[in-house]
Amino acid sequence: MKIIVPMSGIGRRFIDAGYKDPKPLIIVDNKTIIEHVCNLFPKENDYIFVCNENHLKNTNMRAILKKIKPRSKIVSIKTHKFGPVYAVTKAFNLIKDDEEVIVSYCDYGTKWNYSKFLKTVRNKKSDGAIACYKGFHPHMLGSDNYAFAKEKNNWLIKIKEKEPFTKNKMQEFASNGTYYFRKGKFVKKYFKKIIDKK
């Protein structure tokens, strides 16, 4: 499994709140946020971190990432405002067409069973899957900074970033930040389509 973590965003809300470190390097419960994210995927070591070149130059981000995942590859890209899909396209040359891929956000935590998730998607021979949740979660009382999924019988119909499909967002599935693809070529094909639409 290749885990790709786009983490090249500026993190404007955190800067505005007074944080000095880039969001993935903020310490929560004695670990960086990015270490918590990596711990969501036990025994996985094939990582690509797509990072903002300024964060790599001006912080110890590279050393921290290499300490967490020594065999990881780090891709440095210029500051942009095109989002995580764009960032992942900058690592296409490191993705094999036939390997399984998870694209993971760099700034979340979740309680889940990774082994069960993998077993489920592999048994169903799913081309893709998104780990989602719904119901009351305290963070839902605030902003809509989540990707909401429209589904029918647990099959994804549509996903929308930062905007729920209905007025009752707590009854909708929201992505936790984990996107599974059975083949790397699916990542390349569909991420390119998204970028070409913009």
Label for each model-derived stretch:
Residues 2-5, 13-15, 19, 27, ...:
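Conserved N-terminal catalytic core of the sugar/cofactor nucleotidyltransferase
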Residues 196-198:
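Short, charged, surface-exposed loops that flank catalytic or proteolytic processing sites
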Residues 9-12, 186:
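Short connector loops/turns at beta-strand edges and beta->alpha or beta->beta junctions
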Residues 111-194:
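Conserved core of the sugar-phosphate nucleotidyltransferase
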Residues 9, 107, 134:
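Active-site glycine-centered loops adjacent to acidic/histidine catalytic or metal-binding residues
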Residues 8, 16-17, 169-171:
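Short hydrophobic/aromatic segments of transmembrane alpha-helices and their interfaces
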